[in-house]
């Protein structure tokens, strides 16, 4: 119900991905330049249904009251390098987070349990030793809506039926090849991920360019009166981004459900136990095809 707007990384920054070195513990090691090349290669194009300022991505900043806000005049996607176990090997994970100023109330509603200040979407790419995608997955920055998008290089494991929340795979995605980029189709307002597509580098040239920035900078945001502070509190949450849903979901054991939170604080299941940064998560769900 808005206008489709594409955001993309700078053109000409997705050259060949360097082979990583591996330390004695089997952990892939990258120089700063190698990590930057890997993030540039797999940075997604965002295709957002823009119906208001709340649908524009931007940089997290502090306002005059020291509250965290989004500056949509500076489109930024934040990055983090993580790791996971899969098929007996440690694989790099490229984590991209983009922020919106709010999730507005649903049109016509007087009470929307999910609405509130700030909203974020996290997109993660798990790659093999050659830097090629194995699995994509996504959550919102509160930890909700965990979706998996496997490529043809992995197969889902047969798991016993339990009451725990199971693997949710809305679609499979072909591994992006040279000259291709993943496109994330994002709904207006809710910022739900609706579809994952592929586009060529040439077709993404008309996108508004965003900048990639290390997510660790969010722990030292500049204050208007001088000095810095973290976007997150000591509890790992962003103050002011609470949701009314927390009063309904507290019996499920998730503290302040719906509130935006820091890496390491993303529980992704209300039934059972599942955390976004669990290093054994992918090995439990997938096998690598040989």
Describe each region flagged by the PLM:
Residues 1-14, 117-119, 130-290:
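Domain-length functional cores that host ligand/cofactor binding and catalytic or interaction surfaces
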Residues 1-88, 240-290:
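Solvent-exposed N-terminal domain segments of exported/luminal and surface proteins
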Residues 54-136:
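Short N-terminal edge-element motif at the start of the domain
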